[in-house]
Amino acid sequence: MVNFDIARKRMVQEQIVGRGITTPRLLEVFQKVPRHLFVQEAMAVQAYSDGPLPIGEKQTISQPYIVALMTDLLELTGNDHVLEIGTGSGYQTAILASLVRRVWTIERIRPLAMQARKVLDTLHLLNVNIKVGDGTLGWPEEGPFDAILVTAGAPAVPETLAAQLAPGGRLVIPVGDESNQTLLRIRKAADGTLTQETGIGCRFVPLIGQQGWQLNS
């Protein structure tokens, strides 16, 4: 039988710290959040493996290192208001909710949103608002946001999301074609100017929506 506490500690040390991520608060949260609760029960023994896993509905839970890297790139503080596009399993949501004041997260697939809500409630992460809808349009009535994280690959940075960044805000998003993307970090200056930093290559499921890929593309 798998000892999940030991597996989680090994995941943090080997997959996250071992690849150069050393932010103390981040590591503490990854050590606490039970990733195995966010995957299908039959796959729980693989939850801390070094790779993505299917979660149903043709979606995946990202590799632990990628979750850590994208979270680290957001440069979060405890007071941040964060928007997540693509709730998926809810694991990334749980990481964010453990680090910041409040999280708003959008999932287009209702069964995934409902399952994520169930697990988040079990963990008493009550600072999360979930809605089902088109994530590429953001959540303008709750913005602006200090940080926005997109967990699916986009053909370009959605203008709607960039517009919902607060001055000083950070947007992390994979951009490319439907098979391969590059991780980008967008910063918004006080005057509204956007600057872009280019990160590693990555592979995410497509971002579906009005400012993403079309469902039948």
From Swiss-Prot:
> A Gene Ontology molecular-function term?
protein-L-isoaspartate (D-aspartate) O-methyltransferase activity
Where does it localize? Cytoplasm
Q: Which CDD domains match?
A: AdoMet_MTases
Q: Which UniProt keywords apply?
A: Cytoplasm, Methyltransferase, S-adenosyl-L-methionine, Transferase
The record places the active site at 62
User: What Enzyme Commission number(s) apply to this enzyme?
Assistant: 2.1.1.77
* Pfam families per UniProt: PCMT
Write out the GO biological process terms.
methylation; protein modification process; protein repair
Write down any Gene Ontology CC term: cytoplasm
This chain's function reads:
Catalyzes the methyl esterification of L-isoaspartyl residues in peptides and proteins that result from spontaneous decomposition of normal L-aspartyl and L-asparaginyl residues. It plays a role in the repair and/or degradation of damaged proteins.
Q: Could you say which protein family the record assigns here? A: Belongs to the methyltransferase superfamily. L-isoaspartyl/D-aspartyl protein methyltransferase family.
The record's listing under PANTHER family reads:
PROTEIN-L-ISOASPARTATE O-METHYLTRANSFERASE, PROTEIN-L-ISOASPARTATE(D-ASPARTATE) O-METHYLTRANSFERASE
Q: What is this protein called?
A: Protein-L-isoaspartate O-methyltransferase
What does the record give as the organism's lineage? Answer: Bacteria, Pseudomonadati, Thermodesulfobacteriota, Desulfuromonadia, Geobacterales
